[in-house]
């Protein structure tokens, strides 16, 4: 494992190089002739865990919610059965991409399914293991080699592992680095670093945000950047007293998770769960488990957010993450945030702004596109149940306009003397592109 001093040095060098290129772009060059435009040729992955009932109508309903992918388990049909093959056919018919679950999790044994799933057009990924312990990595290397041999001369088939958020029984840094260094080079094609932290905590009327969330987002963001991997994070759409996760009360609880994750550059998401979980004591999900095509309250909320993201995902995905700046709000009576203090690689300033302040605790993710334009994900970090608006104030170095994507819609704001104030509702985030026009 790289020791922490070397790790920090590498991370700093990456950001220093980025900063140098940005400073050139940010200096006054007379301004742009027009606002930057982005080709609508990129799509955010929005998946769902726990497959629905095995009817065409149920899979069409998943697609209509805005899902691009669905994890296929064996709750309703065992692998190899005609019912299972029918499910893959349903996915193909409605335009959903299937992620085949191999069933291995934590410290279980190596899965034995050797089916060639490339013959099923809907199958896009193979999920070989969920939250493996670090002592399973040798088995996962075997799976990676077998996957590469099976699919390398056929069509693209993504090798997928969902990592344990607590470090697989070891040090989290070592766990993630070992995966990136020793396992992912064994496979070709799309490479994804995935994990899950379910941040909305509480029971018996109390509520809080998990302190484990931001450190894991930061860790994955740093390694994904270093190893040129995409990120994937699960969104909490379930609750259980068994796990200390609270109920999802409104659309704000879902939107909040997306924008906090996006402040750390996450490009792909999945709902845990899409279907009401079969695990005893778990609530939530977007559809019921035992009744065909029956929505829960979360379905419409998720559908709205998915549509919101789809309106500007091609813009967001045209930018690369270059760090995150946490801001303690001026109205925070403690003057500090323990979640922010646990972070190791936070930015202390933005490249495109002389100053930024906020009334509430805020995250600002810093991004750059291929032409050197700056982008910022700005997120109200307060728990949505606190019902607190946040006013974020920027003093940009070189901007007279700002493109602000709010609710998925692009709005143009005038930036006077470099200053822009943005009010964020509870759970809200926006994507900001500061621009100087001639």
Residue spans for each PLM region:
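Bacterial Sec-dependent N-terminal signal peptides
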Residues: 19-34
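Intrinsically disordered, low-complexity sequence elements enriched in Ser/Thr/Gly/Pro
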Residues: 2-3, 25, 404, 408
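Bacterial N-terminal signal peptides
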Residues: 10-21
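N-terminal cationic leader/targeting segments used for protein routing and processing
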Residues: 4-6, 28, 418
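Bacterial N-terminal signal peptides that target proteins for export
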Residues: 1-11
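Glycan-processing catalytic domains of CAZymes
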Residues: 30-401, 405-438
